[in-house]
Amino acid sequence: MAEVDKSISFDGRDIRLKVGLLAPQAGGSVLIESGDTSVLVTATRSQAREGIDFLPLTVDYEERLYAAGRIPGGIMRREGRPPEKTILTSRLIDRPMRPLFPSWLRDDLQIIALTLSMDELVPPDVLAVTGASIATLIAQIPFNGPMAAVRVGLVGDDFIINPTYAEIEAGDLDLVVAGSPHGVIMVEAGANQLPERDIIEAIDFGYEAVRDLIKAQQDLVAELGLVIVQEAPPEVDQTLENYIRDRASGQIKKILSQFTFTKPERDAALDVVKDEIATTIKELPEEDPIRVAATANNKALGNTFKDITKYFMRRQIIEDNVRVDGRKLDEVRRVSCLVGVLPKRVHGSGLFNRELTQVLSTCTLGTPGDAQNLNDDMQLDQHKRYLHHYNFPPFSVGETKPMRSPGRREIGHGALAERSLIPVLPSKEQFPYVIRIVSEVLSSNGSTSMGSVCGSTLALMDAGVPILKPVSGAAMGLIKDGDEVRILTDIQGIEDFLGDMDFKVAGTDTGITALQMDMKIPGLSLDVISQAVHQAKAARLHILEKMLACIDTPRIETSPYAPRLLTIKIDSDMIGLVIGPGGKTIKGITEETGAKIDIEDDGTVTISAVDENKAKRARNIIQGMTRKLHEGDVYAGRITRIIPIGAFVEFLPGKEGMIHISQLADYRVGKVEDEVAVGDEVIIKVREIDNKGRINLTRLGIHPDQAAAAREAAAVNR
């Protein structure tokens, strides 16, 4: 393929597309660059898989540490398990790509994005999303694209396309919008309690830039002499499908109109119908075309049954404005909440129920040393002090499966809940704890990620975390049939599975903190998105009202089993003194007091212990070690050793000075041992600190009030 090099500019920032330079054996490849960030994206198509009823698409995004000029740590000195950030980027690529492939496609597809170079300005994720579309077009895979993505930031009152890391950090919005020629297809955002109108305006602003990238891809395809492949679906014998439809349609329609059915009851009734048809087919003669077709395609019954269920559920919503559980389109399911569900050994807990969706969230408070170190990926010397983990055990949907480590879905849902709550967390200075939330999905019938947001808000308040405002969330759905559009509030499982959209919105009563929109159709207009966002606000506020009836403010006290944190600041040149050679000093303080000590490079010292007195003891020791001495200061101390010309006194941890024999008393002392002994407690005053840092002490000229204050201070510090 001929080499092509194209550029497109946004606000003076170029995106460069290089085709034909790298990966010549991949189905399609592109090197997409901005600044010094370069991402190689490939798309490859393999043989069709037999006996499957889904699109076998795999998307992998990987970052090589050489891209940032670094060598991996560990014994092997090579990249290991992918960090969470790369998994989330893989999902970011997958989500807008998947709905643009034909539903009938069964070929193995693999999209791989490798970050080959990365600067400190340009995030590579949106480049990888756009690159996936370009590589797919070049590979001539059937695809309803092109598709492109941009990031939108908000700094002050100005929207910015593809902001730098610094601009994202300084702004109130981090929004990624992906779209096709048919409309917006994906939105992912974190926001600092922004009003709905700002979010809608940002999506519109971003989609205009997406259009430019789509046009650039169309021009690139034409320049390469290619076409955008739109293959017709393979012809399928409808005999078996028609047989199933004739026997199942009436019963399915009746079941879906039984609004009193719970999810398990509805599923069981549908299974009975499906089993009856399967039995009927098995009883046909072996040579019967229906039985032959069913034997040849063992997925046909399930797929046709799903299609019929989907058709009648959607028609019921479009024609009657009623859902399978009898709710109105904008009606939220029954909500209930509990806090303090678990004993206080768990620092905070919240149980959120939305009928058959149930999430138990727990909050654990940790020390600064418990923060997650992100040094293994591209983010140098960064630590996460808020962690949100989401678990989805198989029993939550009544299934049995092996329990494995979290998959991409669990990681993605946890990240969304985390992003939803970050804007309302207290600052490190106000609340120095590391916070870990774990959301356990105990029962699932749709919208467990937003259930996690709600349950986690309850757990945070139960744990005494002074959040700025409580956050609630709701998942919106969509049924689109031609020009007919119905937006559904608080979708349940069947509406998510058979609908056209999953749009999750989280926020406070002030504004939105996070949203995530995924489509199953090629695109959506801004008007429909705007309607969904505003409809979600009403749902969020309704749910928030129920939550506040359970707990309306964070608890004043944290759990008695949570660590007590004390924070002090020392001069950075004193850090070495506190740590000591080989960590000897700090280990000694820890062993003596039982407290845990974390020291940051700026001299911030955080001391933690479940027993607050232990933390105070460690604090006093460190303050004593690092205190600046002044002539005339009075302290209580203890004699540590005696020499012929005087006695040495430890009067602060790590601080020792000498009393000359002439300064022991206001009369002549013949021998030091006649006046003091090792172990004696004495009141001393700093007489002089010489140019070598030696501390000379005296027992003379000390007022009784000074002596009393010194004894009192020493008693407190013990």
Curated annotation (Swiss-Prot):
Belongs to the polyribonucleotide nucleotidyltransferase family. This is Polyribonucleotide nucleotidyltransferase. It holds the Pfam family S1. Its main location: cytoplasm. One of its GO terms (molecular function) is polyribonucleotide nucleotidyltransferase activity. It comes from the Bacteria. SMART domains: KH, S1. GO terms for cellular component: cytosol. PROSITE patterns: KH_TYPE_1, S1. It comes from Nostoc punctiforme (strain ATCC 29133 / PCC 73102). It is found in: Cytoplasm. Residues 563-622 form the KH domain. Keywords: Cytoplasm, Magnesium, Metal-binding, Nucleotidyltransferase, RNA-binding, Transferase. Its cofactor is Mg(2+). InterPro entries: ExoRNase_PH_dom1, ExoRNase_PH_dom2, ExoRNase_PH_dom2_sf, KH_dom, KH_dom_type_1, KH_dom_type_1_sf, NA-bd_OB-fold, PNPase. Involved in mRNA degradation. Catalyzes the phosphorolysis of single-stranded polyribonucleotides processively in the 3'- to 5'-direction. It catalyses: RNA(n+1) + phosphate = RNA(n) + a ribonucleoside 5'-diphosphate. The gene is pnp. It is an enzyme of class 2 (transferase). PANTHER family: POLYRIBONUCLEOTIDE NUCLEOTIDYLTRANSFERASE, POLYRIBONUCLEOTIDE NUCLEOTIDYLTRANSFERASE 1, MITOCHONDRIAL. One of its GO terms (biological process) is mRNA catabolic process. Its EC number is 2.7.7.8. Residues 632-700 form the S1 motif domain. Mg(2+) binds at D496, D502.
